[in-house]
C-alpha cells in the first residue's frame, strides 16, 4: 500500500522494473514519496533497495547495460523523458553515498565548487556558511575552511558531503546507507541532522539498520528478493506504509519476520 496525499506527492514510481543486461534486478515497484517526509528503504542484501534509489535521479544511467521500465515522475513529469536533462535532475535530486567522498579540495571549495558549476551568482561565502550550518558542521570547521576536506573525521566528511549536496539547493536528498561506515556517535549526529533537513527537503534513505529506519523515517518500504534461474536474485517491493504500521502491525508476514529479526 502506498500513502497518498494528493498534491503533496513529489515522486512516484509506477510499474518500475530495472534490468542489468537481460537480468531482471527489481520487478514492478509502485510507491509514492510525499514532500518533506523521510522514507526508509529496508530489506536484505540484494533486494534492490539501492537500485531503486538510484532510479530517482537516474544514477543508473551511468551503469553500462542498466535499463529501466515503467514510470518515475517528479512533480508529475516523467524523469526518463528524453527532454529531461540528467545533470539538472541530479541538482534537484541530490545524493549522499555510503562512503564519505569529499572532493580533494578545501572544505570551502567542497561547497563552492558544485554551486559554481551550477551557475550560482550569489554571495559564495554566505552560501558556504549556510550550507555548513544546515549540515551541523559550521561550528566545527569555521576556522579551518582552507583545510582539506579529506582531513576531517569520517562523520565530519559525511556531513560535509551533505553540506555539498544542499548547497545546490535540491528538493530531494537520496542517502544510500550514509551511516554504514560511521561510529555510533557520528551516526546519531546524521540522524538528528535528517530531522532538521526534512523541514526543507524530502529524504529517501537506504539502511540495513532497523532501529535507524524506525527512529528517523515517516514511511518505510520493505523490499525482499527471490532466487532466479542461474543463481541470481530478483528484488521486489513487499510492503510500503507508514513506519509505525510497518514496524508495529505490518500486513505481510515477511515484513513482520524481517523487522523482528527473524530473517535478513
UniProtKB/Swiss-Prot annotation:
GO terms for cellular component: plasma membrane. GO terms for biological process: phosphate ion transmembrane transport. Gene3D superfamilies: P-loop containing nucleotide triphosphate hydrolases. It is found in: Cell inner membrane. The keyword tRNA processing does not apply. Keywords: ATP-binding, Cell inner membrane, Cell membrane, Membrane, Nucleotide-binding, Phosphate transport, Translocase, Transport. It catalyses: phosphate(out) + ATP + H2O = ADP + 2 phosphate(in) + H(+). ATP binds at residues 43-50. GO terms for molecular function: ATP binding; ATP hydrolysis activity; ATPase-coupled phosphate ion transmembrane transporter activity. It is an enzyme of class 7 (translocase). Its EC number is 7.3.2.1. It is a peripheral membrane protein. It holds the Pfam family ABC_tran. SUPFAM superfamilies: P-loop containing nucleoside triphosphate hydrolases. Signal peptide: none annotated. The keyword Cell inner membrane applies. Residues 11-250 form the ABC transporter domain. Part of the ABC transporter complex PstSACB involved in phosphate import. Responsible for energy coupling to the transport system. Belongs to the ABC transporter superfamily. Phosphate importer (TC 3.A.1.7) family. The complex is composed of two ATP-binding proteins (PstB), two transmembrane proteins (PstC and PstA) and a solute-binding protein (PstS). This is Phosphate import ATP-binding protein PstB. It comes from Synechococcus sp. (strain ATCC 27144 / PCC 6301 / SAUG 1402/1).
Amino acid at each position: 500500500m502506498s500513502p497518498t496525499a494528493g498534491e503533496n506527492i513529489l515522486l512516484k514510481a509506477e510499474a518500475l522494473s530495472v534490468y542489468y543486461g537481460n537480468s531482471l534486478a527489481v520487478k514492478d515497484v509502485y510507491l509514492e514519496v510525499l514532500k518533506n517526509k523521510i522514507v526508509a528503504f529496508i530489506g536484505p542484501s540484494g533486494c534492490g533497495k539501492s537500485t531503486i534509489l538510484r532510479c530517482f535521479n537516474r544514477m543508473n544511467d551511468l551503469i553500462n547495460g542498466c535499463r529501466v521500465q515503467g514510470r518515475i515522475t517528479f512533480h508529475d513529469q516523467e524523469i526518463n523523458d528524453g527532454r529531461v536533462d540528467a545533470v539538472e535532475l541530479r541538482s534537484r535530486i541530490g545524493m549522499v553515498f555510503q562512503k564519505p567522498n569529499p572532493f580533494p579540495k578545501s572544505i570551502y571549495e567542497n561547497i563552492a565548487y558544485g554551486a559554481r558549476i551550477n551557475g550560482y551568482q550569489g554571495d559564495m561565502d554566505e552560501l558556504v556558511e549556510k550550507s555548513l550550518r544546515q549540515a551541523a558542521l559550521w561550528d566545527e570547521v569555521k576556522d579551518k575552511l582552507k583545510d582539506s576536506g579529506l582531513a576531517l573525521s569520517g562523520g565530519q566528511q559525511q556531513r560535509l558531503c551533505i553540506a555539498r549536496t544542499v548547497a545546490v539547493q535540491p528538493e530531494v536528498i537520496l542517502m544510500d546507507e550514509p551511516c554504514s561506515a560511521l561510529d555510533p556517535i557520528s551516526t546519531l549526529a546524521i540522524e538528528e541532522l535528517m530531522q532538521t533537513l526534512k523541514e526543507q527537503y524530502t529524504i529517501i534513505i537506504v539502511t540495513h539498520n532497523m532501529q535507524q529506519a524506525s527512529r528517523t523515517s515517516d514511511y518505510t518500504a520493505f523490499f525482499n528478493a527471490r532466487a532466479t534461474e542461474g543463481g541470481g536474485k530478483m528484488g521486489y517491493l513487499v510492503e510500503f506504509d507508514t513506519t509505525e504500521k510497518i514496524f508495529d502491525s505490518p500486513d505481510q508476514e515477511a515484513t513482520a519476520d524481517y523487522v523482528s529479526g527473524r530473517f535478513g
